Amino acid sequence: VIRIEKREGSEDRFVAPITETQDGALFMQMNRNKRGMTLNPMAPEGQEIVRKLVATADVVVANLPPQTLQSMNLDYDSLRAVKPDIILTTVSAYGRGGPYSDRVGFDGIGQVMCGSVYMTGEEAGPPYRAQVAWVDFGTALHCAFGTMMALEARRQTGKGQIVEGALL
């Protein structure tokens, strides 16, 4: 697994608690045993590096709005031109269609929009967000299952595909 971050690094590096290596503990947990690199996928040299990585990859996982992927030439059609049997797993807040498709989101927004915070907290008090990022983890789990099914389908057919996941 190779994690690609923006040039200045991902925000999750700095979420407390901070370890002795000055990285966030959650970042260290979620990225254990991954290789990592930073690049600018909007720049031609960054796009060339991504294309070289895609040519040797089985799966690309992208956590960006669909329009952002397209603007960086990382949409499914662009990746398939590099490697015809590639599997692209996309995770966005609201999916490819609909009025919110270009918006970003995270677990807290997903909890509010699905109504789960309405069912928490004290009866006379404000709602509470769950302390566990269950929307993020649930979305990741469904995307992982979908990706495994796509890998099996490719083994049987030789064809790649896109797997779409959304918080809602």
Predicted regions and their residues:
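N-terminal helix-loop segment corresponding to the beta1-alpha1 unit
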Residues: 1-162
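A short, charged, Gly/Pro-tolerant segment at domain boundaries
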Residues: 165-168
